[in-house]
Amino acid sequence: FSTMQMMSKADVLDKFRPDEFDFICIDETHRAGAESYQRILEYFKPQFLLGMTASPERTDNFDIFDLYDYNIAYEIRLQQALEENLLCPFHYFGITDLEIDGETFDDESGLRNFVKLVSDERVDYILKQVEYFGYSGDRVKGLVFCSRKDEGEELARKFCQRGYRARMLSGDDSQAVREEVIDRLVSDTREDYLDYVFTVDIFNEGVDIPEVNQVVMLRPTQSPIVFVQQLGRGLRKSDDKEFVVILDFIGNYKNNFMIPIALSGDRSYNKDTMRRYVSEGARVIPGSSTIHFDEISKKRIYQAIDSASTNDLRTLKEAYSNLKQKLGRIPKLKDFYDYGTIDVTKFFDKLGSYHEFLKKYEADYTTELSEKEEAILQFISRKLAK
């Protein structure tokens, strides 16, 4: 066993022959595009190379599937993992974030208004909710995700003023400090234990804290990937908890439509499917997990769904690139359905046909159609999209 940081050092690599190991397992392999990972992967020549990741969909266009000859040995998503009882059940509550002076937190002003983000009124409101919805176990062991470092620092300070033990962790803290703070959070014997750890994004991935029994989200949803990563910090099973409580404080953000996408695992970006999940998610979530949105949160999510552009080129290109990397070839229309990714009619709506998308954005696509054939294809595609 070795950490990536240790093994990527030249003097450490030199201690091993390229064929030293028959089997190598790379954890967090979605990071394999980084120079340090590449140094390791290019040096060793094992007989069998296995990669593991909880984030196979990338936004940086690096093809991790190519490293493994597009051979996916096993894949399991959140919904299936819950069905098979591999994860701790969760109770998700979408809670309306506080209005201050008649104003809601939104994309235009909310995240920039530091005074309102950390106001006593908001802190008291947050604490009222975390105390009301509670946790499983003898004491709370919570992670709080914020939008900004200074917000997390000030909120942690104000939690402490109100009798809670809290600490902010950021990317500026060393690995030793992070490990010490996590130990204080999970320990039941230390006198300097912590109730809450605030952070921005250093716990999105690669951190295993099974004891966490409450996750508080005080930031807008950046993407379905990040949402599931942060939700997942509480989904590891532990003898000390029966379930984890997820509290999502929902402002008036344009990305709110991503919440049902993340929770459902449905990547079709179909607006009717999103709306249905907001109203019926509690019925269809597997096992003993539950999902609940208060009425104002529902309204905000519906508004975000209505105004969302779900067939913009960035979304289409990202969905296409992820599927192409997984398959190792240009996807067929049926592949999008088989692999549960974006609704193909989004391509029809945006560009008239999938052929037109490939012609413009896929360098390896060589199929040519006559003007008449293209017109017929676009006519049929647009009819299907309606």
Report the location of each language-model feature.
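Long, largely alpha-helical accessory region at the distal end of helicase-like NTP-driven motors
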Residues: 131-132, 136-137, 259-385
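Conserved RecA-like ASCE P-loop NTPase motor core of nucleic-acid helicases/translocases
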Residues: 140-148, 169
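Conserved segment of the helicase C-terminal RecA-like domain
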Residues: 224-229, 233-264
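Conserved interdomain linker/interface between the two RecA-like ATPase lobes of SF2 helicase motors
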Residues: 72-143
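Conserved helix/coil segment N-terminal to the catalytic DExD/H
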Residues: 2-23, 34-39
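Conserved helicase ATPase core of P-loop NTP-dependent helicases/translocases
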Residues: 12, 153-155, 164-203
